[in-house]
Amino acid sequence: MLSKKKNILLSLSLAVVFISVVYIIVFLNLKPAQNQLVLVRDIDLEELDNREALNKYTGEKIVYNVRMGNVTLGKSVFNRLQPVELDGKMVNLMSFETRLARFSDKEKIYSAAGTFLPLKIEREISNWPFLEKISERYDQDKFTLTIIKTKGKVSEERVIRKDGPIHNSIILPFVLRDIPELAVGWSMAANLPGQKFEIKLSSLKTLKLPAGEFKAYHFESNPSKFEIWVSADERRIPLKIKGAGPLGYTLVMKEYKLGNNNGSMVDSR
């Protein structure tokens, strides 16, 4: 019985990691075409209206149910926090936390104003009785990612080098929001530290969720790893994420609130 219980907890932990990876992959605005790469790599942050970029969605909160079939296993919560200073510049700050039975995964994400390219991520994973801390630092000029993992008193460091800007985690929907028009057939490439995917907008559908009914853009990945639904309005809210395979773990939006730039919340359905 104890062995079976351990296997179930391990399966749930792997599922959450998989869902988090899917969430990261989905929203990349890095098309295969070279002009998209140039747009991200050559952008001058000093020329952007940083104040507007930093404050537009401050206070936003999205709550998701984590499901396997019709069973709810726990929840994930995304928060857009007040901008902070990092290395002498004002940057975006966001958090993403997943909680299941005896498992939690907390992330604090710092990203550049305007581009939303990740600069620093602090992560804490609790898989009872074990605790792991992960620090990620991104050099978007040299296209490198330095990862330091700490368990107890033991730390290990890994450096990943890529051929272009590196994206990560929950910040990617904000890049998608800046695309003026989306049409069926539109595609983008996901350039993650460990793997690349192509994401294609396959259809426009009506989606019924615990948070309400939405018209949604339906994206599918190639290779076939996941499906994603994003609201078909100016907010481009990530509504639902479904992983492929026999486990069928899914993130489904339960609640959405939009802040007033000062962190106070208003229901924006």
How would you label these PLM feature ranges?
Residues L2-V17:
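N-terminal Sec-pathway targeting helices
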Residues A15-I25:
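N-terminal signal-anchor transmembrane alpha helix of single-pass membrane proteins
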Residues Y23-Q140, D178-R269:
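Acidic, serine/threonine-rich low-complexity disordered tracts
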Residues N127-H167:
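Hydrophobic, well-structured mid-protein blocks that either form specific transmembrane helices
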